[in-house]
């Protein structure tokens, strides 16, 4: 992400459910009413992921709410959206996705400094249940340390 960016939606569960190995930025093909809905914050990318289809990358299962003023020309809220990447980036992603257990997860949607909508993607591997438990224990220990230090001083 560059100097200025306004984050519209984040996938907070992604960091809990996956090990994020690599991050990348991609543009997204939108309709007019989708852009207006994103500006008003009616977006959810909780369970969204990206996958390759015919040498292109698409974003699946992302929700962009309907824009009320668009009337009959409105968009479908859960449609498949094409991501804009260079050919070399697509080939690199396809090569990394061929590794077993790797997934491309949407981490956030934001407006960059040029006011364009961008999607931050993360190349991820799924966490096991014991990894999640360990992460929870670590977070609780850090909170407890902060409480102890706060009470000391």
UniProtKB/Swiss-Prot annotation:
GO (cellular component) term, any one: cytosol
A single BP term in Gene Ontology: trans-translation
Pfam families documented for this protein: SmpB
SS bond list: none
Keywords: Cytoplasm, RNA-binding
Subcellular localization: Cytoplasm
UniProt keyword DNA damage, yes or no: no
Molecular function terms from GO: RNA binding
Protein origin, superkingdom: Bacteria
Matching InterPro entries: SmpB (IPR023620), SsrA-bd_prot (IPR000037), SsrA-bd_prot_CS (IPR020081)
NCBIfam families named among the record's database cross-references: PRK05422.1 (NF003843), smpB (TIGR00086)
Summary of the function given for this chain in its UniProt record: Required for rescue of stalled ribosomes mediated by trans-translation. Binds to transfer-messenger RNA (tmRNA), required for stable association of tmRNA with ribosomes. tmRNA and SmpB together mimic tRNA shape, replacing the anticodon stem-loop with SmpB. tmRNA is encoded by the ssrA gene; the 2 termini fold to resemble tRNA(Ala) and it encodes a 'tag peptide', a short internal open reading frame. During trans-translation Ala-aminoacylated tmRNA acts like a tRNA, entering the A-site of stalled ribosomes, displacing the stalled mRNA.
HAMAP family for this protein: SmpB
Sequence similarity: Belongs to the SmpB family.
Identification of the protein by name: SsrA-binding protein
């Amino acid at each position: 992400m560059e100097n200025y960016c306004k984050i519209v939606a984040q996938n907070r569960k992604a960091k809990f459910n996956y090990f994020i190995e690599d991050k990348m930025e991609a543009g997204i093909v939108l309709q007019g009413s989708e852009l207006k809905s994103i500006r008003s914050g009616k977006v959810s990318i909780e369970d969204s992921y990206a996958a390759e289809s015919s040498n292109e990358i698409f974003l699946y299962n992302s929700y962009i709410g309907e824009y009320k003023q668009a009337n009959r020309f409105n968009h479908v809220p859960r449609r498949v959206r094409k991501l804009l990447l260079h050919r070399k980036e697509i080939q690199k992603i396809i090569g990394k996705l061929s590794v077993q257990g790797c997934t491309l997860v949407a981490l956030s949607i934001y407006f960059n400094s040029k006011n364009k909508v961008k999607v931050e993607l993360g190349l991820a591997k799924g966490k096991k249940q014991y990894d999640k438990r360990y992460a929870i224990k670590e977070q609780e220990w850090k909170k407890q340390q902060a409480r102890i230090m706060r009470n000391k001083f």
